[in-house]
UniProtKB/Swiss-Prot annotation:
A family per Pfam: SHMT
Compartments where found: Cytoplasm
Keywords of this entry: Amino-acid biosynthesis, Cytoplasm, One-carbon metabolism, Pyridoxal phosphate, Transferase
Record keyword Cytoplasm present: yes
Organism of this sequence: Thermosynechococcus vestitus (strain NIES-2133 / IAM M-273 / BP-1)
Binding annotation for (6S)-5,6,7,8-tetrahydrofolate: 120, 124-126, 353-355
Top-level taxon of origin: Bacteria
EC number: 2.1.2.1
The name this protein goes by in its record: Serine hydroxymethyltransferase
């Protein structure tokens, strides 16, 4: 019996829910920039007996017996992560990117210390000091942003704020910034004011690993990332550093500082994903992600849709929907009606609330995994533009949905995931 057979036999209700999600992923175009499709091997690793094993501590230094084989798995993940990013030390245990960031804060900061991070509305992340997040409640937060004219990082502002506030930690790396991050310039500023420098590369980790974005590991004191998104692994976190002594502090901040037992089945999946990312095929994939983003951006701009900062250097872009008199909330709904999955997003200096927004964030990693090239993304740009420019036209909506269905059929996803029909009798 396969794992699907076991699920159907034991809990057909859950199986039916999973089946519907499989069908949604297969029949929709995934353009959420933070999402991707893992390989069957990554998914298989997460479904192994490693889920049964407690393994508090680190390889060779556990608090439980019977860890000799999970030690091998975790050490392999560590070694591959170090090789992939050129790091001296890696911790593969964080359950998420947020957990990785919290561990760094515990290792380097005390409550009340000053940190600097990008404003969430300009493309930052909740864990970089947003007032609704614990990082914004425990620390004195100074936010920087983008220049109002270029919509690119305002490094003069970053330097001035750092000199004025003397932060203990400066965070660079973002969730909705479509341009290359100048890590070297951040390093100069951090050195000038005596601050630690942390890069959160959750969105661009795959591009960094494959050489399509500058690597922050040689320049930053610590680097955090998720292991999904452009890295195309399981949902999880990772901490990297070039400093072995700092690495020991970071290890203690993960366990026992912020977590208990690691998820060894997920760590096994991380090891598989890192192994995949070390292969030439992954570099080719990331190059296609970039080319597809350029094609999508060009197609949208050719149809009078304004992009924040005028385009993209990486895998994502932001449409300023004020050019078509729509909100992000409205555009997200319009896309959903034609089976394109996106997310509303604030844009710099957004006049709308975070629950409404004036932007729509798009990314190319997931559809690139399905096999899309510049040709298909040119068509995707047409479909998006047609829908946004004529939101009330039912004929256009139906035609867009038909084109989406044809693209999905042309590039099937997970054809091996076969469920009995129907799951629920």
């Amino acid at each position: 019996m396969t794992h699907i057979d076991w699920l159907v036999q034991t809990d057909p209700l859950v199986a039916e829910m999973v089946q519907r999600e499989v069908q949604r992923q297969q029949q929709h175009l995934e353009l959420i920039a933070s999402e991707n499709f893992t390989s069957p091997a990554v998914m298989a690793a997460q479904g192994t007996v490693l889920t049964n094993k407690y393994a508090e501590g680190l390889p060779g230094k556990r608090y439980y017996g019977g860890c000799e084989f999970v030690d091998e798995v975790e050490q392999l993940a560590i070694d591959r992560a170090k090789e992939l990013f050129g790091a001296a030390h890696a911790n593969v245990q964080p359950h998420s990117g947020a957990q990785a960031n919290f561990a760094v804060f515990l290792a380097l900061l005390n409550p009340g210390d000053t940190i600097m991070g990008m404003d969430l509305s300009h493309g930052g992340h909740l864990t970089h000091g947003s007032p609704v997040n614990v990082s914004g409640k425990w620390f004195n937060v100074v936010h920087y942003g983008v220049h109002p004219e270029t919509e690119r990082l305002d490094m003069d502002q970053v330097r001035d704020l750092a000199r004025q506030h003397r932060p203990k930690l400066i965070i660079c790396g973002y969730s909705a910034y479509p341009r290359v991050i100048p890590f070297a310039e951040f390093r100069q500023i951090a050195d000038e004011v005596g601050a630690y420098l942390m890069a959160d590369i959750a969105h661009i980790a795959g591009l960094v690993a494959s050489g399509y974005h500058p690597n922050p590991v040689p320049l930053c004191d610590v680097v955090t990332t998720t292991t999904h998104k452009t890295l195309r692994g399981p949902r999880g976190g990772l901490i990297l550093t070039r400093d072995e002594d700092l690495g020991k502090k970071l290890d203690k901040a993960v366990f026992p500082g912020t977590q208990g037992g690691p998820l060894e089945h997920v760590i096994a999946a991380k090891a598989v994903a890192f192994g995949e990312a070390l292969k030439p095929e992954f570099k080719a994939y990331c190059g296609q992600v970039i080319r597809n983003a350029q094609a999508l951006a060009a197609g949208l701009q050719a149809r009078q849709l304004r992009l924040v900062s005028g385009g993209t250097d990486n895998h994502l872009m932001l449409i300023d929907l004020r050019s078509v008199n729509l909100t992000g909330k409205e555009a997200d709904r319009l896309m959903g009606e034609i089976h394109i999955t996106t997310n509303k997003n604030t844009i710099p200096f957004d006049p709308a609330s975070p629950f409404v927004t004036s932007g729509l964030r798009l990314g190319t990693p997931a559809l690139t995994t399905r096999g899309f090239t510049e040709v298909e993304f040119a068509e995707v740009a047409e479909i998006i533009s047609d829908r946004l420019h004529a939101p009330e036209d039912e004929a256009i909506k139906n035609r867009c949905r038909e084109r989406v269905a044809a693209l999905c059929a042309q590039f099937p996803l997970y054809p091996h995931l076969q469920f009995p029909q129907p799951v629920l009798a």
